[in-house]
UniProtKB/Swiss-Prot annotation:
Disulfide bonds: none annotated. The gene is ABHD17C. It is an enzyme of class 3 (hydrolase). The active site is at S211, D276, H305. It is a lipid-anchor. This is Alpha/beta hydrolase domain-containing protein 17C. GO terms for biological process: negative regulation of protein localization to microtubule; positive regulation of protein localization to endosome; regulation of postsynapse organization. Hydrolyzes fatty acids from S-acylated cysteine residues in proteins. Has depalmitoylating activity towards NRAS and DLG4/PSD95. One of its GO terms (molecular function) is palmitoyl-(protein) hydrolase activity. One of its GO terms (cellular component) is plasma membrane.
Length: 329
């Protein structure tokens, strides 16, 4: 990143050159604006890596583990030569696991493969076995599945939904590099894995995107109908985040969700904090106004970008939406 200099709309002139000229293509601009993959907080081991004589995780004190017990369909073998339903999850201390081994044993992990030939780390959390709905959760830009695992268990148990999630290319155990094209290929692979491996039909899938995760969520929802869509702190487009005065989508813009949201035919709940310091509240408002099937939104007064979940109305609104406002609730 260049040294600070004179600033324009929150960016120095040096930063503007770095952003748009090295090289000036949407995928590179997108990567510079949006992707902050952390050091992986977990590993996924195949059966042969856990057999006699195989190396153990770093230490019992620094890791927790869960066996992935799901039995997938025969046509969905594990990537990397592992047998179906046999991988195990090992979390590092940085994953900040908040539950017992019993809850961790309910977490299933496996690999899928994207159309762009990246290996995709996937996670299925059985929070509510009798629940009708499963959330396909696309997380934010600076976390991985290990860090999100505890949150998924807490959220799913409170809203009575199972949760399926995945790491973007270049995040966690997923191969490749983060990019806009990979985002779309990643969620396509996750959607197909949820449907074929677990037999979840589209009318029982709720797409949930948070922050950068709203980008693949909107893209998928504009192409497939599902039970519902939840957009948590969405962005209109990459340029509109960097330059708030942008009024139209340019050819070199990235993540143009504002141009896709009108094609979403499923019910959409938009959630945004009024004091969001990363993606301005105006983004959530614009997405809500452009969405043809938007339900009553949740504007969390005083909330920022990373603390909406701490407000009581967050869970209350999710429960109301899922339990009472969906067509087949």
């Amino acid at each position: 990143m260049p040294e600070p200099g004179p600033r324009m709309n929150g960016f120095s002139l040096g930063e503007l050159c770095w952003l748009f000229c090295c090289p000036p293509c949407p995928s590179r601009i997108a990567a510079k604006l949006a992707f902050l993959p952390p050091e992986p907080t977990y590993t996924v081991l195949a059966p042969e890596q856990r057999g006699p004589g195989a190396p153990a995780p770093a230490s019992a004190a620094s890791t927790s583990s869960a066996s992935a017990a799901a039995q997938p369909a025969p046509q969905q073998p594990e990537e990397g030569g592992a047998g179906p339903g046999a991988c195990s999850l090992h979390l590092s201390e940085r994953a900040d696991w908040q539950y017992s081994q019993r809850e961790l044993d309910a977490v299933e992990v496996f690999f899928s493969r994207t159309a762009r030939d990246n290996r995709l780390g996937c996670m299925f959390v059985r929070c509510a076995p009798s629940s009708r709905y499963t959330l396909l959760f696309s997380h934010g830009n600076a976390v991985d599945l290990g860090q999100m695992c505890s949150f998924y268990i807490g959220l799913g148990s409170r809203i009575n939904c199972n949760i399926f999630s995945y790491d973007y290319s270049g995040y966690g155990v997923s191969s490749g590099k983060p990019s806009e094209k990979n985002l779309y290929a990643d969620i396509d692979a996750a959607w197909q894995a949820l449907r074929t491996r677990y037999g979840v039909s589209p009318e029982n899938i709720i797409l949930y995107g948070q922050s950068i995760g709203t980008v693949p969520t909107v893209d998928l929802a504009s192409r497939y109908e599902c039970a519902a869509v939840i957009l948590h702190s969405p962005l209109m487009s990459g340029l509109r985040v960097a330059f708030p005065d942008t009024r139209k989508t340019y050819c070199f813009d990235a993540f143009p969700s504002i141009d896709k949201i009108s094609k979403v035919t499923s019910p959409v709940l938009v959630i945004h904090g009024t004091e969001d310091e990363v993606i301005d509240f105006s983004h959530g408002l614009a997405m809500y106004e452009r969405c043809p099937r938007a339900v009553e939104p949740l504007w969390v007064e005083g909330a920022g970008h990373n603390d909406i979940e701490l407000y009581a109305q967050y869970l209350e609104r999710l429960k109301q939406f899922i339990s009472h406002e969906l067509p087949n609730s």
